């Protein structure tokens, strides 16, 4: 046990590193360093069996297929993230957990630092050191995602809207505050592909009907989406399967994705590091 004030790190569990206070509990799985339990202010913010995980991929679009990015960069869909170390410290009322990774299928290193306070609020800094070699695949996006229980089906965000928008097609989407539902996010393209993302976001709130949930902000404007579909369900793989969007069954959950760097459809990119802040919202949040 390490403790300071009411914040405690339990490192004597065989399978989990546990950060807890009277108001919150966050479990890190020792096998991969990922958050597998996130509870705060009486809320269970992760769906059963879900994790908070880094994400380097999105469902390919028609333009991506045309540029063959679905083939060239496919390694980043599952880069073989391998935990190298999981360290923790506790000082000044903040628990700091640092996970470091290598990749099996691409050349690079990843570090994720989590700074957790008594309320269960998390400051996440994710840093990617990717190889700059010409032959290495590029990322389609750089961010994180988590699967939340279906009750968190409301969105309140400040960014571009009200419809989906991306770096290369956003001029017609004005910056403002928008309140929407997850059901409204999925655009039924004829063929399944990336959909529903909002860009230039300053603040994203994912909450239930009572206004309880999480608020995400970042060190600079970011993109985000919340769907009833995992990106894997919208990804047809190496070749077009001529599937139809209406044939895909929605999940009884909410897939929340935050994106700190992203390619435009038909293009790709490389990125460095960023920080995002995940804050707990109670029913009094405005």
Label each region the model flagged.
Residues 2-286:
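Beta-strand/loop-rich accessory regions of lumenal/periplasmic or secreted enzymes
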């Amino acid at each position: 046990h390490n403790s300071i004030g009411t914040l405690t790190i339990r490192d004597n569990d065989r399978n989990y590193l546990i950060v807890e206070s009277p108001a919150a509990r966050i479990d890190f799985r020792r096998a991969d360093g990922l958050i597998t339990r996130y509870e705060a202010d009486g809320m269970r913010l992760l769906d059963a069996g879900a994790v908070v995980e880094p994400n380097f991929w999105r469902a390919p679009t028609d333009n991506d297929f045309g540029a063959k990015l679905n083939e060239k960069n496919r390694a980043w869909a599952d880069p073989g993230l391998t935990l190298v170390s999981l360290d923790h410290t506790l000082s000044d009322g903040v628990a700091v957990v640092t996970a470091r990774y290598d990749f099996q299928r691409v050349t690079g290193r990843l570090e994720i630092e989590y700074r957790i306070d008594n309320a269960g609020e998390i400051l996440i800094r994710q840093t990617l050191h990717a190889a700059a070699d010409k032959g290495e695949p590029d990322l389609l996006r750089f961010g994180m995602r988590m699967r939340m229980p279906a009750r968190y089906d409301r969105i309140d965000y400040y960014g571009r809207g009200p419809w989906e928008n991306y770096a290369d097609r956003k001029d017609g989407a004005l910056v403002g505050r928008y309140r929407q539902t997850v059901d409204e996010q999925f655009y039924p393209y004829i063929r399944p592909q990336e959909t529903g993302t909002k860009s230039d976001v300053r603040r994203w709130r994912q909450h239930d009907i009572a206004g309880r949930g999480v608020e995400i902000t970042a060190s600079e404007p970011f993109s985000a989406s919340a769907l009833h579909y995992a990106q894997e369900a919208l990804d047809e793989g190496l070749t077009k399967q001529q599937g139809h969007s209406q044939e895909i069954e929605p999940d009884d959950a909410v897939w929340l994705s935050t994106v700190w760097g992203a390619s435009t459809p038909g293009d790709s990119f490389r990125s460095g590091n960023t920080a995002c802040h995940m804050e707990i919202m109670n029913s009094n949040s405005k």
